């Protein structure tokens, strides 16, 4: 007969990141501190997707907020021991400008666009949208990559970057700090225009260690 006793409270170690993939953790962190969650959540803010990957691969983290493509690669590398648990971040990418007029994807032709997230979802999303609009990334549009979202935000504010692909919450930060920085394009809308019903632009997901879930299924489901 199933027990009605609640699952024992355990500590779940989570690797999150600055930017959209970690943004959804803020309320969880607060609720955990207040003691109002089913489990105790120990959230570490990793400096990059690679750092979060390292934490979940080594067992330092049980759960990691990762770019969706990174989670897919990790699933294959670990022979399925790191699995996708949930999608937690849909499209939050925007083209922002500082002193450039951009009203459509076509307006990016011949321009230099700055981005972060090389090798992650932003790169694949931008390349797909450009290609589907008849432009070859690197040929028709020059793309320069910054190390992280914070560096890119600083570049658009200083005017070093005139056009940038930036995620929330950094978009709100830069447009609030400088009214000359404008949101030119919503890349979720641009993705939908070319992909139709075939796919949805997802940015981030929660990946979990399979062995952790198997050992703590009740607590994880909570």
Name the predicted role of every residue range.
Residues 3-146, 155-158, 162-168, 178-186:
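Short, glycine-/small- and polar/acidic-enriched structural segments
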Residues 69-70, 144, 150-222:
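Pocket-lining segment of extracytoplasmic ligand-binding domains
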């Amino acid at each position: 007969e199933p027990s009605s006793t609640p699952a024992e409270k355990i500590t779940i170690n989570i690797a999150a990141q600055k930017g959209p993939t970690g943004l959804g953790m803020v309320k969880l962190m607060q609720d955990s501190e207040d003691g109002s969650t089913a489990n105790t959540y120990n959230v570490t803010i990793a400096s990059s997707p690679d750092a979060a990957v390292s934490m979940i691969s080594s067992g330092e983290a049980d759960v990691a907020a990762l770019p969706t493509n990174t989670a897919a690669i990790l699933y294959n590398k670990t022979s399925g021991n790191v699995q996708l648990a949930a999608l937690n971040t849909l499209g939050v990418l925007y083209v922002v400008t500082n002193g450039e007029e951009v009203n459509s994807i076509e307006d990016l032709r011949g321009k230099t666009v700055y981005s972060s997230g090389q090798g992650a979802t932003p790169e694949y999303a931008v390349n797909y949208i450009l290609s589907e609009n008849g432009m070859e990334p690197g040929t028709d549009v020059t793309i320069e990559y910054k190390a992280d979202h914070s560096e890119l935000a600083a570049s658009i504010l200083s005017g070093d970057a005139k056009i940038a692909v930036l995620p929330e919450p950094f978009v709100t930060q830069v447009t609030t700090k400088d009214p000359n920085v404008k949101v030119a394009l919503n890349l979720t809308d641009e993705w939908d225009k070319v992909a139709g019903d075939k796919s949805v632009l997802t940015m981030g997901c929660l990946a979990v260690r399979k062995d952790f879930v198997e050992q703590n299924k009740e607590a994880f489901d909570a």
